[in-house]
Design a protein with these regions (language model features):
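A membrane-interface helix-boundary motif in multi-pass transporters
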Residues: 4-31, 223-242
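Short amphipathic helix-loop junctions that connect adjacent transmembrane helices
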Residues: 98-114
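Helix-to-loop junctions at the C-terminal end of transmembrane segments
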Residues: 127-141, 225
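Structural signature of the two symmetry-related core transmembrane helices
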Residues: 143-158
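Helix-loop junctions at membrane interfaces in 12-TM secondary transporters
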Residues: 160-172
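Intracellular juxtamembrane helix-capping segments at the cytosolic ends
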Residues: 181-194
Length: 260
């Protein structure tokens, strides 16, 4: 909030321009990271492991570990099905988050309103994540994940009708309502599906899926926006990812989510 204020109201901080506000924002973030990293460096002791790390052929061994983990995952059908669904819908979700500013800019909204909209998303997202967790306990993890994806589908459809900054703020608020909740519920569902003795390697693969997923979405949005010469066509095209994602989810055995 302070950094955003430095950009929007530079004169209040005795700065000459918004550009200077951006520069000092980066500096303040660096100082923030340094100060709050000090306790980590001083008081957190690293555990010692007996296993020695072999640095010969690191890339080959990394790919081999990923391949071996994938072979293990294939033995657990519910896990594999969920990861396929997750790849689809998380790609679309991350695309919306990452390209929101570019989308707003293409629609002609000024940068100040876009930044405020992003902050608005974060303010809503923090309490909404806790509320989402409560609702997931009450109505079920699977049900709330489906609800979250349906809201994202509505966001894509609603984006076709944006005509003002108010509409963009509504979209930002909707994203804030479900962004953290969908991610946390997804991780919880995955943790319920996997064997606990393999949690480390399976979650490593889960994170790899999440990081590598943001490839198709941006390319799809850019391609469709270019073909139709309209950024709205790009956002609505994300339904190509959301719909398979939500449909594949229904093939995950619900009984697998129940822990003994």
């Amino acid at each position: 909030l302070i950094n955003v204020s430095m950009y929007l109201y530079p004169s209040f901080f005795n700065l000459d321009s918004q550009t200077e506000g951006i520069l000092y924002s980066f500096l303040s973030v660096a100082v923030w990271w340094f100060i709050f990293s000090i306790p980590l460096f001083l008081f957190v002791k690293q555990k010692n492991f007996d296993e020695l790390i072999d640095f010969k052929n690191p890339f080959q061994k990394s790919f081999l570990r990923v391949f071996n983990t994938f072979k293990e995952i294939k033995k657990y059908k519910p896990v594999l099905i969920f990861l396929i669904a997750y790849w689809f819908y998380i790609d679309a979700i991350d695309t919306i988050v990452r390209m929101a500013v570019a989308y707003g800019t293409d629609l002609g909204f000024d940068s100040s309103k876009l930044i405020i909209a992003l902050i608005f998303t974060q303010f809503i997202g923090f309490p909404a994540t806790f509320a989402y967790g409560y609702l997931a306990e009450k109505f079920g993890l699977f049900n709330m994940l489906v609800v979250g994806i349906l809201i994202y589908i509505f966001i894509c459809i609603y984006s076709l009708f944006i005509t003002s900054a108010t509409d963009f703020f509504i979209l930002a608020g909707l994203v804030g309502l479900v962004q953290g909740g969908v991610q946390s519920v997804s991780r919880t569902i995955f943790s319920r599906l996997i064997p606990q003795e393999k949690a480390t390697e399976f979650f490593g693969f889960y994170n790899l899926i999440g990081k590598s997923a943001v490839v198709v979405g941006p390319a799809l949005v850019g391609w469709m926006a270019y073909i139709f010469n309209n950024p709205k066509a790009g956002i609505i095209s994300l339904l190509i990812l959301f719909i398979p994602g939500i449909l594949i989810l229904f093939y995950v055995p619900r009984a697998s989510l129940v822990r003994d």
